[in-house]
């Protein structure tokens, strides 16, 4: 709250419009006066941060969205030198990033279940779901389809949105909107050197305009990694922290017809030898993800009141890991998840202009999945071999409708419902409702209610290898209820503020726990109830001189109960009670460069209980990250970005998932509570566009 008051005080000291015209494409002046010209540019830039498309599959303003939403603009992405989507959203109120050296995962409002891989967050790229069909994984770091150079803005939508999207929109949605041809150079290339993440090179092209365009991009990353020490795993330092990724895309549209093809391949090594790997091996573990997303569709305005859109899509995913074992041949896991689907939706304005509207649609997806685990040399399925082979095909159908209206200037509402049928898991009905009371463009309140669900993935519901994981038993859908009140205000030009009070209750959450019949194996179980409630505030401020600032904090209380016990608060693994972020960026100093600084605070967190004694593990201390960036845009066609991450050099002790526990010897089991986060990193990026 102090942050909001401070920004408000700064705003009253300088009531000028809130954007630096030099950071935006040139626009015609509104008049001959400089102030009017700046105001015209301000209006254009403000629309970028005030419009949301991912919360209801249509454009809405922030004041009329049935969620608490933050939009990370392209200008903010460039100024602060974010290198991945994960870095960009880690500075958003209530959001934190967890890199446990297996994957990059995102926590929201204190909820990040160890061993989860963003499966409770729906990730969209230009409206298409990235979550794959085998494990429901969605990458947001280097393990994703999208280069940060392609991103126009990122929408962070908190809370369940199953009433529109069905499964996976559980804790929230990350909607990545890429740059269109009109805002992309005809051709561009960028390369960077990073002291931990190695070399990153990307290039792309764009032709056409708003209604007819073709654009594409490529990105390659070769990570150097670090040498690290985890005494619980090995007495000596461990290397083998590298990774390699490749991503490419082609996107096009012609009038109302659109299509996109995106693909990536990502390999990550882990020096910490998960799944009882041999820590003395030079490369004890690596995993490879490969994914292809194809989508095409058409949108047509049938009448001024009726718009219809249809799309078809395919999402093809493959996973493989390789575990070097002590005293035996290596062990391999393979997973495959291919999904094919189609959606038809429409919007009809019952009362115009925008007084009452109905959005409705139907969607069907077919999933073909396969899992296989084997010791090398024995890869045949039974009865001819010892491999664990699990084929499973299923389909999901959904139908949804949402009514929204604004009976008066100051009052609006939304109410929606979706029914989903999973042919092998569960059927769910997901409602949401919202009431909006506002003085338009000045201040308002939103009262929000939503229910959501998440089906266990094919990996959770059916996978086993009898080496690290035992067979799951009768898993069912997770459910969540959300209550939230949002106060928002734009007290002066350039200043936006939000204060939220929230209560989330998630039940039947699938957790990765020791098998009650064999503690040396992990098993997926519908064991958990998680409750999170608290306050969240954020603010952003721009001036016409080019200053930009943002900040936020979340104070939450998170509780957990397993198998029907009473909810206990304070000792939930990976659940910080306090999150904070702050960023300030200068105008172009000397007309050349922006200087930006950012701070991220991650509160103290509990780790998992000791595997043997059941006693609480050591707590992870609070962590403060400081970053600095200098950004020189369009210097004779060149862009230059230089920065330093984690200036203090203090590593966050990341809460470790059960994958790292040493359980091969039942008489000498070791719980790995924490693994080190990244240290200080320097980077330099140079690009050219024409």
Model-derived features: positions:
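Short, acidic, small-residue-rich periplasmic hinge/interaction motif at the N-terminus
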Residues: 18-78, 125, 301, 490
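Extracytoplasmic beta-strand/coil segments of soluble accessory domains associated
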Residues: 54, 86-132
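N-terminal periplasmic accessory domains that precede
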Residues: 85-88, 105-109, 121-126, 141-144, ...
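Short acidic/polar hinge/loop motifs at secondary-structure boundaries
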Residues: 129-158
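Periplasmic-side early beta-strands and strand-to-turn transitions of outer-membrane beta-barrels
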Residues: 162-163, 175, 182-184, 192, ...
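Outer-membrane beta-barrel signature, preferentially recognizing the C-terminal barrel domain
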Residues: 278-301, 337, 392-394, 438, ...
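Gram-negative outer-membrane beta-barrel transporters
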Residues: 406-413, 501-505, 525-610, 689
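C-terminal beta-signal and adjacent terminal beta-strands/loops
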Residues: 507, 601-608, 632-690
């Amino acid at each position: 709250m102090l942050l909001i008051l401070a920004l408000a005080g700064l705003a009253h000291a300088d009531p000028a419009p809130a954007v630096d015209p030099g950071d935006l494409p040139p626009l015609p002046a509104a008049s001959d006066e400089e102030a009017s010209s700046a105001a015209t540019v301000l209006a254009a830039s403000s629309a970028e941060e005030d419009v949301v498309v991912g919360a209801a599959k249509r454009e809405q303003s922030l004041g009329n969205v049935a969620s608490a939403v933050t939009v990370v603009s392209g200008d903010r992405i460039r100024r602060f030198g974010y290198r991945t989507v994960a870095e960009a959203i880690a500075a958003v109120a209530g959001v934190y990033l967890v890199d446990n050296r297996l994957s990059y995962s995102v926590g929201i409002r204190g909820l990040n279940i160890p061993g989860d891989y963003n499966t409770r967050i729906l990730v969209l790229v230009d409206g298409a779901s990235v979550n794959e069909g085998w494990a429901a994984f969605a990458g947001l770091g280097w393990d994703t389809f999208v280069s940060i150079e392609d991103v126009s803005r990122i929408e962070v939508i908190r809370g369940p949105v199953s009433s529109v999207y069905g499964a996976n929109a559980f804790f929230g949605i990350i909607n990545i909107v890429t740059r269109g041809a009109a805002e992309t150079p005809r051709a561009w290339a960028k390369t960077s050197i990073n002291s931990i993440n190695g070399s990153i090179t990307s290039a792309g092209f764009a032709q056409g305009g708003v209604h007819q365009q073709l654009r594409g991009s490529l990105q390659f990353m070769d990570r150097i990694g670090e040498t690290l020490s985890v005494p619980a795993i090995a007495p000596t330092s461990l290397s083998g922290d590298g990774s390699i990724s490749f991503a490419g895309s082609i996107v096009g549209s012609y009038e109302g017809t659109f299509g996109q093809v995106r693909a990536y391949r990502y390999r990550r090594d882990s020096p910490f030898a998960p799944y009882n790997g041999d820590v003395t091996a030079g490369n004890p573990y690596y995993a490879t993800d490969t994914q292809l997303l194809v989508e095409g569709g058409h949108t047509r305005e049938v009448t001024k009141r009726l718009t219809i859109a249809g799309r078809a899509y395919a999402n093809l995913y493959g996973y493989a890991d390789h575990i070097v074992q002590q005293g035996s041949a290596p062990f391999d896991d393979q997973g495959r998840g291919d999904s094919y689907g189609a959606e038809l939706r429409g919007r009809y304005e019952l009362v115009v202009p925008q007084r009452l509207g109905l959005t409705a649609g139907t969607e069907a997806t077919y999933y073909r999945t396969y899992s296989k685990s084997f010791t090398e040399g024995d890869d045949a399925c039974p009865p001819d071999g010892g491999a664990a082979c699990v084929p499973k095909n299923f389909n999901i159908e959904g139908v949804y409708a949402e009514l929204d209206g604004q009976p008066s200037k100051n009052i609006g509402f939304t109410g929606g419902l979706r029914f989903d049928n999973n042919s092998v898991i569960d059927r769910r009905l997901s409602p949401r409702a919202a009431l909006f009371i506002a003085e338009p463009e000045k201040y308002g309140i939103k009262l929000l209610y939503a229910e959501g669900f998440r089906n266990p993935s094919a990996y959770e519901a059916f996978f086993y290898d009898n080496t690290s994981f035992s067979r799951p038993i009768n898993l069912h859908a997770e459910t969540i209820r959300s209550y939230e009140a949002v106060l928002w205000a734009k007290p002066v030009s350039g200043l936006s503020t939000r204060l939220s009070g929230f209560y989330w209750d998630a039940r039947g959450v699938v957790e990765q726990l020791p098998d009650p019949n064999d503690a040396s194996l992990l098993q997926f179980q519908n064991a958990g109830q998680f409750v999170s409630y608290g306050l969240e505030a954020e603010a952003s401020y721009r001036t016409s001189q080019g200053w930009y600032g943002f900040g936020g904090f979340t104070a939450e209380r998170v509780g957990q109960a397993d198998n029907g016990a009473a909810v206990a608060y304070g000792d939930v693994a990976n659940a910080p009670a306090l999150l904070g972020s702050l960023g300030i960026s200068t105008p172009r100093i000397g007309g050349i460069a922006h200087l930006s600084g950012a701070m991220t605070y991650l509160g103290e967190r509990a780790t998992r209980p000791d595997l043997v004694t059941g006693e609480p593990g050591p707590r992870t201390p609070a962590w403060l990250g400081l970053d600095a960036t200098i950004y020189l845009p369009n210097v004779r066609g060149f862009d230059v970005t230089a920065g330093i991450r984690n200036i203090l050099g203090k590593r966050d002790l990341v809460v470790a998932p059960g994958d790292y526990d040493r359980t091969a010897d039942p008489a000498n089991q070791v719980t790995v509570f924490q693994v080190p986060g990244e240290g200080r990193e320097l980077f330099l990026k140079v690009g050219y566009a024409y």
